[in-house]
Amino acid sequence: MTYSFFVDMTCGGCSKAVNAILSKIDGVSNIQIDLENKKVSCESSKMGADELLKNIQKTGKKCSIIA
């Protein structure tokens, strides 16, 4: 399943932090980060949107589920 999130990223460091968190989760793949539009998309075979959102929130950035 593919999920999209709004993440209030302001720099490359923010996007790297989000990528690092998602990359460590088993079953997450195809991570795409659009820094300009503050959008993060990924595929997950084991985790739902709410669980992914909780992990992204560990970066300290405001975020919400888009789809």
From Swiss-Prot:
MF GO annotations: copper chaperone activity; copper-dependent protein binding; metal ion binding
One Gene Ontology term from the biological process aspect of the record: copper ion transport
Residues involved in Cu cation binding: 11, 14
Entries under SUPFAM superfamilies matching the protein: HMA, heavy metal-associated domain
Coiled coil: none
Keywords (A to Z) from UniProt: Chaperone, Copper, Copper transport, Ion transport, Metal-binding, Transport
Any Pfam family: HMA
Residues covered by the HMA domain: 1-64
PROSITE patterns reported for this sequence: HMA_2
Superkingdom, natural source: Eukaryota
CDD domains: HMA (cd00371)
GO cellular component: cytosol
InterPro entries, alphabetized: Copper_transport_ATOX1-like (IPR051881), HMA_dom (IPR006121), HMA_dom_sf (IPR036163)
UniProt record similarity statement: Belongs to the ATX1 family.
Function description: Could bind and deliver cytosolic copper to the copper ATPase proteins. May be important in cellular antioxidant defense.
PANTHER family reported in the protein's UniProt record: COPPER TRANSPORT PROTEIN ATOX1
Protein name, as recorded: Copper transport protein ATOX1 homolog
Organism: Dictyostelium discoideum (Social amoeba)
Phylogenetic classification of the source organism: Eukaryota, Amoebozoa, Evosea, Eumycetozoa, Dictyostelia
